[in-house]
Amino acid sequence: MSTAAPILLTPGPLTTSARTRQAMMVDWGSWDDRFNQLTASLCEQLLAILNGADSHHCVPLQGSGTFAVEAAIGTLVPRDGKVLVLINGAYGKRLAKICEVLGRSFSTFETAEDEPTTAADVDRLLCADSDITHVALIHCETSTGILNPLPEIAQVVEQHGKRLIIDAMSSFGALPVDAQKVPFDALIAASGKCLEGVPGMGFVFARKESLAAAAGNSHSLAMDLFDQHSYMKKTGQWRFTPPTHVVAALHEALLQYNEEGGLPARHARYAANCQALMEEMGKLGLRSFLPAAIQAPIIATFHAPKDPRYQFKDFYERVKAKGYILYPGKLTQVETFRVGCIGHVTPAQMREAVAAVSEVLREMEVLDI
């Protein structure tokens, strides 16, 4: 079994459609009115996905999703603020590292990698520390695929009069979040995840009042979202050279997103991908790290086979030779590997990928799963 181009079963970058790739074949002038209109249309469509046009601004930013996360924390958390960082995986730890590097006061609450943070945990922590001004949460922790209970946590944060910053990198566009029902100061996502664009830009949905009050907070010129938004509102342009081809690709990806049926349809396809993956991997005896109740249909983590003949690098290269790119594990306690359910892929392709995994395990003579 082989494919002409590898299928990326990863959480981003991921497999994109031919239409999305073709959109990058046109060169754009960064100051041209047509490109400014493209940016404005993009922000309008992104805001519509979370029903945020009345309450939030969409501020795009060049770079990886982590650039946008750092920009959001640096812009929206005052220099005398304090962040409660909720951690149950590598990307929660990255939030804490960002706060440390930025010089923002922070505390952490860490649960096991297979244990969601609960609203009760957050309530207790906020009651115990009145200095906390902001709470930072990973919606879907990409190191495992675990889904944290965002709506419940958001309500507790609001009840305490605090501000919520959501890293929705691996969930935005596939898992529903309504800005009029889930209170947040910032929700951060990126082009190369569930929207099926290419990597190269992030965007922050910032509460209008909070962004308006954020002048002078940022540690950085390039990552100042207040300045980025102000300049874009005044001129229609990005402050610094924009990733023009990435913007064009994301605009085209959003056209396809809406043609597919928007968030409900995207979620349904990813859920079907995840179900097909779990069913077929289960037939091979490969065990999911997470119980189904807390597994998001974004990326799945599997226990590595116990057989000493299994070595991930060899396994990875053999599966890649059959046309599929997997992802290494990112857990601290047990050996795992990960398979993404997102991107321009179908349940049938997920089954074909598992068939390739089965062939590889036989070739490696891995018997003890």
Swiss-Prot record:
GO terms for molecular function: 2-aminoethylphosphonate-pyruvate transaminase activity. The modification N6-(pyridoxal phosphate)lysine is found at K193. Its EC number is 2.6.1.37. Pfam families: Aminotran_5. It catalyses: (2-aminoethyl)phosphonate + pyruvate = phosphonoacetaldehyde + L-alanine. GO terms for biological process: organic phosphonate catabolic process. Keywords: Aminotransferase, Pyridoxal phosphate, Pyruvate, Transferase. Its cofactor is pyridoxal 5'-phosphate. Involved in phosphonate degradation. Homodimer. NCBIfam families: PhnW-AepZ, PRK13479.1, transamin_PhnW. Belongs to the class-V pyridoxal-phosphate-dependent aminotransferase family. PhnW subfamily. This is 2-aminoethylphosphonate--pyruvate transaminase. The lineage of its organism: Bacteria, Pseudomonadati, Pseudomonadota, Gammaproteobacteria, Pseudomonadales.
